[in-house]
């Protein structure tokens, strides 16, 4: 059963979205929260699969919760559901699955649920392939599916509002979010070093100190990847430095 959490400080908006979700005829457990504190309490307790999140929560910012969720080992998929359309690009920069604007449309919500199922199915299939010793990654590039060896991937990152997967031979602009790509990559080889970048540790050539306890990674193809303070400690631990 799909577990859904709706986070919105307006009760009518929560009720409308819950009603439309139930009309999809999917089996799901729907819970609601009116603020970030309540949302995190429920997330720790119920571990939702899918989070519908407003941007403006009575002085609190939905993007703050999205950034905090990215640090979780198994974060829920995030769908921003808001009255504002100007934050769509920013939403995808924090790896949102989708972006809905009020008033909600039932057909549009069905599209979001289909997208979630497809992404979730791809993750499960990738994990199964990984357990079977296969290290291929299927990338959605435009209307095509491109298959690459994970060992050939130098990094995956969000650049100019798009998620790119970089190999020595090519840079693929994909439709998946960075969180989805990260979940498909083997933990033994890849590490997140920034909210916008996941790198293959085999291709790190040099680590350059930057400012304010941050770093730049020079990859073997010449790419320069930033390392934020949030992830620097984990990187140094992994590389024994």
Curated annotation (Swiss-Prot):
Modification after translation: Phosphorylated by LytS.
SUPFAM superfamilies in UniProt: CheY-like (SSF52172)
Gene Ontology biological-process annotations: regulation of DNA-templated transcription
SMART domains: LytTR, REC
Known role: Member of the two-component regulatory system LytS/LytT that probably regulates genes involved in cell wall metabolism.
Protein name: Sensory transduction protein LytT
Keywords of the record: Cytoplasm, DNA-binding, Phosphoprotein, Transcription, Transcription regulation, Two-component regulatory system
HTH LytTR-type domain residues: 137-241
Origin: domain of life: Bacteria
GO CC annotation, single: protein-DNA complex
GO molecular function, one term: phosphorelay response regulator activity
UniProt keyword annotation of Disulfide bond present: no
List of residues that carry 4-aspartylphosphate: 54
Primary location group: cytoplasm
Annotated organism of origin: Bacillus subtilis (strain 168)
Response regulatory domain span: 3-117
InterPro entries xrefs: CheY-like_superfamily, LytR-like, LytTR_DNA-bd_dom, Sig_transdc_resp-reg_receiver
PANTHER family hit by this protein: STAGE 0 SPORULATION PROTEIN A HOMOLOG, TRANSCRIPTIONAL REGULATOR-RELATED
Cellular compartment(s): Cytoplasm
């Amino acid at each position: 059963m799909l577990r859904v959490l709706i986070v919105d400080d307006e009760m009518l908006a929560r009720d409308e979205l819950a009603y439309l979700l139930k009309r999809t005829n999917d089996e799901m457990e729907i819970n609601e929260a009116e603020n970030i504190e309540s949302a995190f309490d429920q997330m720790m307790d119920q571990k939702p699969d899918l989070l519908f999140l407003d941007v403006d929560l009575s002085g609190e910012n939905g993007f703050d919760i999205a950034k905090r969720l990215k640090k979780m080992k198994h974060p829920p998929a995030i769908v921003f559901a808001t009255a504002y359309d100007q934050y769509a690009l920013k939403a995808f920069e924090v790896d949102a699955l989708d972006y809905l604007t009020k008033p909600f449309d039932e057909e549009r919500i069905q599209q979001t649920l289909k997208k979630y199922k497809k992404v979730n199915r791809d993750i499960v299939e990738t994990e199964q392939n990984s357990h079977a010793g296969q290290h291929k990654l299927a990338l959605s590039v435009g209307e095509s599916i491109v298959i690459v060896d994970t060992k050939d991937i130098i990094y995956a990152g969000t650049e100019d509002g798009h998620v790119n997967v970089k190999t020595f031979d090519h840079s693929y602009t994909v439709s998946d979010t960075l969180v989805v790509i990260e979940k498909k990559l083997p933990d033994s080889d890849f590490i997140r070093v920034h909210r916008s970048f996941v790198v293959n540790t085999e291709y790190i050539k040099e680590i350059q100190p930057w400012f304010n306890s941050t770093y730049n990674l020079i990859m073997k193809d010449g790419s320069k990847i930033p390392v934020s303070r949030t992830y620097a400690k984990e990187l140094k631990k992994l590389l024994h430095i």
